[in-house]
Amino acid sequence: VEKNTFATSAYIATSAETAFQYLCSLKNLDDWTLFSRMQEQIDEDTWIGTASGYHRNLYYHVKKLESPLFYGIEWHCGLEYDQYFQVYPVLLFPPDYIEPGTDEKGVYFHWLSFVDPGRQTQMIMQGIHTVHTSECRSLKANLERREGLTTAAKGRYFIDTDTIYVDAPVELGVEYLKEVKNIDEWAHLVRPVGELSGQSGDFLDEYDQKVTISIRVHSLSKYYLLEEEYFYPEHNFYQRSVALLIPAAYSFADPEATGFILHRITFWKNEGQFTHGKLQIEDFGAESMNIKRFLEAKAGNLKSFDRGMSYVPVHKLQQQELVGSH
């Protein structure tokens, strides 16, 4: 687990467009957050307001994400106007993206948070999971109450994630992961059938079932979104997942930060379990470790893998090396 990254998700019984419009208005933070209260509007997309994790006010800024796949935004926070040190990407997945052809309505909300280890306080680190998880439930209730619901709606799926820091250029990661032939190197549960090239290819899974794996890459804000689709033709079964490849310099607002965060977003049934594809979040996590090892080796950063799954700022690495030399 990447210890500087936090994610929370919810199924919300409202339309994706309704949720998107609601989230784009910073003033609505007053209604569902613990104590983000907007006090003064600076421009169309920026306010000054109170904060749950600080004694002083913050600047809040919202940015719409341009994607043909689904709605998304980013919230940004900082102590000065246009100088933001926290970024919170939000994606809204329609049910038919998760399960093509489904009749389920609503939207799956996913909220990602980064806390720069160079700026974080102990309270932020200890409290962010609790606060954001509760705020996510509050957001769900606010939107569902507007739809006339009196209790929480339950979706057919839930979201789980795996996150790891990769000390290699994000462009190297994109070039490596978009080539389906490289799956034979970093994935251990499938084997290729014949020669592979491009962004789609045929494989056999761990039970010798035929599966076509497709990879698609999209630019999103200052980072990349990678779609991975498993399709079992003999069972007409799809399993889709999404990965965000976010430069550490952007996620932690630190130009000295190298590498990128690999954040994998996966979808699982609330009732029953899959019989094909990846069957547990650890299947994704194991792959991510392999991806990290291969990419860091390609980048010449052979020491990074031993440091674990989390980003460590340059100055902390220098301190550790100094201590280790004495």
Please report, for each region that a protein language model flagged, where it lies by residue.
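Hydrophobic ligand-binding cavity/cleft-lining segments
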Residues: 1-43, 141-197, 317, 321-326
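Short, surface-exposed coil-to-beta transition loops
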Residues: 5-7, 55-60, 80-90, 159-161, ...
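Short, exposed beta-strand/loop patches in secreted or surface proteins that constitute
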Residues: 37-41, 60-65, 100, 190-196, ...
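Short, hydrophobic/aromatic-rich segments at coil-to-beta transitions
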Residues: 41-49, 66-74, 195-202, 219-228
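Short, charged/polar surface micro-motifs in flexible loops or helix N-caps
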Residues: 53-56, 64-71, 81, 207-211, ...
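Beta-strand/loop substructures that line and gate deep hydrophobic ligand-binding cavities in soluble
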Residues: 74-141, 231-293, 302-306, 324
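Short, flexible loop/turn segments with low-complexity composition
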Residues: 149-155, 300-312
